[in-house]
Regions:
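Active-site beta3 strand of CheY-like receiver
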Residues: 44-50
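Two-component/phosphorelay signaling modules centered on CheY-like receiver
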Residues: 11-29
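Short hydrophobic/Thr-rich beta-strand motif most characteristic of the beta2 strand and flanking loop
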Residues: 25-34, 40
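The C-terminal output helix
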Residues: 102-113
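Conserved small/polar residues in nucleotide/adenosyl-binding loops
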Residues: 116-120
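C-terminal output helix
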Residues: 92-101
Length: 120
């Protein structure tokens, strides 16, 4: 069973993603902020991290997918340059998210950066 960390500042988004992913057979953990996510990554070997654009990704070599409420080409390019495996806009198309998670877990590309942040 693949382990997914959901890092999002919105409690409703964390809960929605968690419910759906667990229904689909994933094991999930959810974190509201970078500190909680980093602590979880110390204890649990995640297969993928789903992250809101405003959150920094813990440097654990785990592939990540950015979930953004900002639908801009610049934001997407920045995310990919910073190592994101994919960039999806909110509201999330769950079928596309599931495809992205499976693709990332089945064939993860090397994560070339330490963390992702959208401080631009």
């Amino acid at each position: 069973m693949a382990k997914v960390l959901i890092l999002d500042q919105s409690k409703s988004m964390r809960n929605t993603l968690r419910e759906r992913l667990e229904y689909e057979g994933f094991s999930t953990e959810a974190a509201e902020d970078e500190e909680a996510a980093s602590n979880m990554c110390e204890k649990i070997p995640f297969d993928v991290i789903l992250s809101d654009t405003g959150c920094k990704i813990p440097d654990k070599g785990v592939p990540f997918i950015v979930l953004s409420s900002e639908a801009s080409i610049d934001s997407a390019v920045e995310a990919v340059r910073n190592g994101a495996q994919d960039y999806l806009t909110k509201p999330i198309d769950m079928n596309r998210l599931l495809q992205s998670i499976h693709r990332t877990i089945d064939d993860p590309a090397p994560v070339p950066c330490l963390l992702y942040t959208s401080d631009a």
